[in-house]
């Protein structure tokens, strides 16, 4: 079960008001605000020519990441990486922990990690919240 704080709820309300997209989850860090939107609402969240995202970035004065939701863990992981081609996803279960090893090409590794590691850190936290699984990046 995902617990949302008052700040999370304020951010979700502002995002939904501006974009019209339905937000399933929100994660706020000092550098980034990340939203998970309902499957099929990603285009609405971004807006024509990125207009909604631009307004939201200005409102929060930090980087904004938007991901599409999925009930399938593998598809959710692919959604976390967006336009970055994921070559392979292997999920290993040991005892009570799950770890997803995500393979990307060496050329895409920097984009997958993100500036200051923000994309991979957010991805790990969101995957842990949604599926109780850790995320490891592997490059080939």
Language-model regions, residue ranges each:
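RNA-contacting regions in translation and RNA-metabolism proteins
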Residues: 1-140
């Amino acid at each position: 079960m995902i617990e949302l704080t008052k700040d999370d709820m304020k951010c979700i309300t502002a995002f939904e008001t501006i974009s019209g997209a339905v937000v399933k989850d929100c994660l706020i860090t000092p550098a980034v605000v990340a939203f998970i939107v309902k499957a099929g609402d990603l285009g609405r969240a971004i807006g024509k020519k990125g207009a909604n995202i631009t307004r939201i970035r200005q409102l929060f004065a930090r980087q904004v990441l938007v991901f599409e939701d999925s009930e399938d863990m593998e598809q959710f992981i692919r959604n976390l990486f967006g336009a970055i081609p994921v070559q392979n996803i292997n999920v290993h279960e040991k005892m009570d922990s799950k770890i997803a090893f995500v393979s990307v090409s060496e050329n895409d590794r920097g984009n997958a990690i993100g500036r200051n590691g923000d994309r991979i850190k957010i991805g790990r936290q969101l995957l842990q919240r949604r599926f109780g699984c850790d995320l490891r990046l592997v490059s080939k």
